[in-house]
Design a protein with these regions (language model features):
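Local cysteine-cluster metal-coordination motifs and their immediate loop/turn environment
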Residues: 11-24
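Short, amphipathic alpha-helical interaction segments positioned at domain boundaries
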Residues: 369-381
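C-terminal scaffold of the Radical SAM
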Residues: 2-3, 24-46, 53-336
Length: 381
């Protein structure tokens, strides 16, 4: 049995980035001790939902690197002491922003058990950072990386392409800076205009100019070539790593592995057919778990997946990773009729060069990755 993962959502930010639709609230009024107490109470109430062991803990947000030292230590020490860990190496990840990194914090994070950090850089171009509402500049990002490198040997950098005013040349410079820093892992995401975000409003009003699809495709191509030349392997559509440094935790989301999500807006999955969603409600969360009284109504909302939904999710997530879908495993899970339907969908794709079928594994080709959403949806029909 594959070990589960634990996710903790820290819902506080200094200021929301213009493109972000993740759930978060202002940090100035945050009751950090109360929040940590609620996470502990929720874990104690729900720990039985994970029947086996866990081998990953991911603290994301929001901006968890905002958390002061004392409540952070309390949270991490409790979780490390109380999670039923598997026998393999633990991966304990923390999302950080460059402006929060200091020698003292990095030393404390490492001392308390963090062994992987994911730093949201997005760009090494100061104009691009300003346009999307980031608080750091490129120099601060590089300084933060250098500090983290003194204390940690597993660092991931997040980059974004398709930003307002971004060019292929400025993107190449950001990628080159990231490669020069030599992190173990690089994630690269295309800017998505999410409904209701300030970035979407600005775009709809014509106040910002975004790169078109042709430029976005060229940025992705140049990224992939440069990272491949530098020893990074693309193991998922948006993720590249040095050998052995793939994100163990995120891999659980793509491979139908159970995980428990704690905190407002966090979601969980039992590895079979049940998903649970915590509402995006900080006040309600603090009220529900502040007292530590068990036996009340669950805070989360349940969703039971149908057989068809389970199959569709399997296709949608497995086709994101480099190994793709193993046909033997697919047939064992869903039956021969489902396999024949998948193969029929594969054979009727307008362009057969978008998907590779090698030794019983179906995966996206490099051209297929460029149009991944449409290809994967066609296979899942």
């Amino acid at each position: 049995m594959i070990d589960a993962g634990i996710y903790v959502h820290v819902p506080y930010c200094r200021r929301k980035c213009l493109y972000c639709d993740f759930f978060s609230g202002g940090y100035k009024t945050a009751d950090w001790e109360g929040f940590v107490r609620c996470i502990i109470n929720e874990y104690n109430e729900r720990r039985g939902e994970i029947s086996g062991k866990a081998d990953t803990l991911y603290i994301g947000g929001g901006t968890p690197s905002l958390m002061p030292d004392t409540p952070f230590r309390s949270l991490l020490r409790f979780l490390i002491d109380n999670i039923s860990w598997g026998i393999g190496k633990r991966e304990i990840s923390l999302e950080v922003n460059p402006e929060d990194v200091s020698e003292e914090k990095a030393r404390m994070w490492k001392r308390e058990g963090v062994n992987r950090v994911s730093m949201g850089v997005q760009s090494f171009n100061d104009d691009e950072l300003m346009r999307v509402g980031r608080r750091h500049d490129s120099r601060r990002a590089i300084e933060a990386y250098d500090v983290l490198r003194k204390h940690l040997d597993n660092i991931s950098i997040d980059l974004m392409f398709g930003l307002p005013g971004q060019t292929v040349e400025s993107w190449e410079k950001s990628v080159e800076t990231a490669v020069t820093l030599n992190p173990e892992h690089i994630s690269a995401y295309s800017l998505m205009l999410e409904e209701g975000t300030p970035m979407t409003v600005l775009a709809e009003k014509g106040r910002i100019e975004l790169p078109d699809d042709r430029l976005n495709d060229e940025m992705w191509r140049r990224l992939s070539v440069r990272l491949s030349e530098s020893g990074y392997r693309q193991y998922e559509i948006s993720n590249y790593s040095k050998q052995g440094y793939e994100s163990k935790h995120n891999g659980k989301y793509w491979r139908q592995v159970p995980y428990l999500g704690l905190g407002p807006s966090a979601h969980s999955y039992d590895g079979d057919r049940e998903r649970r969603f915590n509402p995006p409600d900080i006040t309600g969360y603090l009220k529900r778990f502040g007292s530590g009284q068990e036996g009340r109504e669950p805070f989360y909302r349940r969703e039971m997946l149908t057989d068809e939904e389970i199959k569709e999710e399997y296709i949608l997530t497995r086709m994101r990773v480099s190994e793709g879908i193993n046909l033997s495993d697919f047939r064992e899970r869903f039956g021969k009729a489902a396999e024949e339907r998948l193969l029929h969908n594969l054979m009727t794709l307008p362009n057969q060069e978008l998907v590779e079928n090698k030794e019983g594994n179906i995966s996206l080709s490099s051209d297929g990755i460029m149009v991944a959403d449409s290809v994967i949806l066609a296979l899942a029909m």
